[in-house]
């Protein structure tokens, strides 16, 4: 690559200023699939890079120490590309590794060497793109396009940025950005460690236009950055959720097949696994629509394809009304509304249940208590997410002084056992 800059200003042992810096790829690669004839030759550019330091910080044996680093009006373009097969079947490569001749060692080295420490970091008005010009592309179905990622308006304020032993760590006071898909982050803060296939964030607080998340601990595990091309099945997520609010509008940018899901709820608990195969532990949920609150433990497999998604869950002490239940189920339906409002109107039920099976063919064993009586049910629900067919309920039920009249809003019958 060629490294150019318009102006350099150096105040000995205090400040270094670079203006209009750019790193130009001499041999940009065309898209192997032929989907685009664009060659990305600019790897990096920045209007200003400013570093402030002391003589002591420069001559330390532990690595470069800077008091402050500022980057403004910058752009970085990462290109995923093919390389010749060296016999190991691995043809994945990228322009960063090619330009700087970075090679993956045959035996990974666990160096404890410190590379740098920066006390204060500020990045303003930066962009980042990641284009997949390789032959291995993940099909695009909507939301964020991991084959053509384009992030703008990146603003970062951070402190104690440290790179040692192959791990980057630091405290992010505030991070914000927007992606061309329409997704945007209004603010992120937390203490982060990134490296060796993991991103660990403590006290993560995230806010976008739809959701608000508070995670005392959050971790992503992945083989390498290329795993994010198939985020749903190759990036493992583990986290503790404090009092938060989730809107599925946020999730659809990462799992576009869930487009149309209108669920909004307050949540807290723990999750572990991949988007398409995860466990939830002690997840407390309260639907924004009301009438549907409780705790869930279990697993879900198959997302984002709702028709193939399976559930194995236990529901503890769920308080719900028929209005709340039908609103909750309707939010999972792309079209139409489920209406059970004429049944048991105004009555609250406490439910303990087990559910298993496909989302569209769900077996439920439930114990139901209320002021109008008690019931045990062993039923199957079908066509829950199929808007083209009516919901079908089959199975057996036992009641104990359950007021059927109040259940169906009729005076013709009373309590039944």
Outline where the language-model segments fall.
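Amphipathic hydrophobic-ligand
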Residues: 29-52, 66, 135-156, 180-191, ...
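Flexible beta-edge/linker motif
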Residues: 6-86, 101-133, 150-173, 195, ...
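Outer-membrane beta-barrel translocator/channel fold
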Residues: 244-248, 321-322, 406-408
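Extracytoplasmic loops and strand-loop junctions of Gram-negative outer membrane beta-barrel proteins
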Residues: 250-253, 333-337, 400-403
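Transmembrane beta-strands of outer-membrane beta-barrel pores
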Residues: 73, 174-176, 208, 241-245, ...
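Membrane-embedded beta-strand positions of outer-membrane beta-barrel proteins
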Residues: 239, 269, 296, 313, ...
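Solvent-exposed beta-strand/coil patches in large extracellular/periplasmic or lumenal scaffold regions
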Residues: 94-136, 152-180, 187-188, 200-204, ...
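Extracellular/lumenal and peripheral-membrane lipid-interaction modules
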Residues: 1-4
């Amino acid at each position: 690559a060629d490294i150019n800059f318009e102006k350099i200003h150096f105040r000995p042992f205090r400040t270094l200023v670079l203006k209009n810096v750019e790193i130009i790829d001499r041999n940009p690669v065309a898209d192997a699939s032929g989907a685009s004839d664009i060659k990305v030759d600019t790897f990096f550019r920045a209007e200003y890079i400013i570093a402030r330091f002391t003589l002591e910080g420069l001559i330390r044996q532990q690595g470069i120490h800077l008091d402050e680093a500022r980057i403004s009006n910058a752009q970085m373009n990462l290109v995923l590309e093919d390389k010749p097969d060296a016999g190991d079947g691995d043809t994945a490569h990228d322009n960063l590794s090619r330009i700087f001749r970075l090679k993956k060692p045959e035996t990974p080295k666990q160096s404890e060497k410190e590379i740098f420490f920066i006390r204060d970091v500020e990045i303003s008005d930066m962009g980042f793109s990641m284009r997949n010009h390789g032959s291995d592309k993940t099909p695009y179905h909507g939301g964020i396009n991991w084959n053509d990622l384009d992030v703008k308006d990146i603003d970062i304020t951070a402190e104690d940025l440290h790179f040692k032993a192959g791990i980057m760590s630091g405290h992010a006071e505030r991070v914000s950005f927007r992606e061309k898909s329409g997704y945007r982050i209004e603010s992120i803060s937390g203490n982060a460690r990134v490296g060796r296939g993991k991103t660990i964030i403590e006290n993560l607080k995230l806010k976008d236009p739809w959701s608000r998340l508070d995670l005392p601990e959050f971790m992503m595990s992945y083989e390498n950055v290329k795993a994010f091309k198939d985020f749903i099945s190759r990036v493992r997520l583990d986290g503790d959720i404090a009092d938060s609010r989730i809107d599925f509008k946020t999730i659809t940018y990462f799992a576009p097949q869930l487009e149309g899901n209108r669920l909004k709820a307050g949540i807290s608990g723990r999750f572990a696994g991949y988007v398409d195969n995860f466990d939830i532990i002690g997840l407390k949920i309260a639907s924004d629509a009301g009438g549907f609150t409780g705790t869930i433990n279990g697993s879900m497999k198959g997302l984002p394809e709702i028709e193939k998604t399976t559930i194995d869950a236990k529901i503890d002490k769920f308080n719900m009304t028929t209005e709340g239940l039908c609103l909750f189920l309707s939010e999972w339906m792309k079209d139409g509304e489920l209406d059970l409002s004429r049944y048991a109107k105004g009555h609250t039920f406490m439910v303990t249940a087990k559910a298993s099976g496909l989302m569209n063919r769900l077996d439920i064993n439930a114990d139901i208590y209320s002021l109008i009586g008690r019931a045990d049910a062993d039923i199957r629900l079908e066509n829950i997410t199929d808007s083209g067919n009516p919901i079908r309920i089959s199975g057996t039920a036992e009641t104990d002084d359950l007021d059927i009249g109040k259940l169906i809003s009729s005076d013709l019958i009373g309590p039944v056992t």
